[in-house]
């Protein structure tokens, strides 16, 4: 990092936002009561008050099963809320980093590159792609597609037939923060680690008694293989 940057994070009380706040003592993370992203005026007021150099937009409706139950609410938060952030940031020329998801891909081949065809398979993925579309309208922005887990795997079951580049938050979050601080990195980038099944990830994170789960056992239509081609990431973050 060449100079100090003032960073504002939306969704600072969430899993990712909380961890990002720990990485830099001066991160600003206004509570939802102050910055409801569905309130365009509140977003503008916060950016004028804190005058950040970078906004990392983590706030989102993130649970695919819950999104299936409340798709309209999810679309509002993930698309309209993101559009409010984009407009306010662009009017003030503030760098915007948007946290997206690997679920924007169909999941039929894996090893996805940033420019590969997008084909969401559930409401959650569509809502996050809608947010991406809003962010793409602003040149001073970075879309980070990623997937992460708490460092302690939180579930009793894990998919044996779903493959991903997901990893522990302690691995993913520092890379996100590093990229957010690089003004020359714009567009879209994939962040993750090697391809693995979700069960393999659970075992890696110490969940030795995790039970098998299969894609056919759930109703929210998760994609089968959203693993990433990480060439772009490695070229940027190489030592």
What is the predicted role of each segment?
Residues 175-225:
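Mid/C-terminal beta-alpha module of Rossmann-like enzyme folds, strongest
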Residues 84-119:
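Conserved Rossmann-fold NAD(P)-dependent oxidoreductase catalytic core, especially the SDR/UDP-sugar
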Residues 25-46:
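Adenosine-cofactor binding site in Rossmann-like domains, unifying the SAM/SAH pocket
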Residues 155-183, 187:
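Substrate-positioning beta->alpha
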Residues 119-147:
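Active-site Tyr-X1-5-Lys
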Residues 38, 69, 73-84, 118, ...:
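Glycine-rich NAD(P)-binding loop of the Rossmann-fold in SDR/ketoreductase-type enzymes
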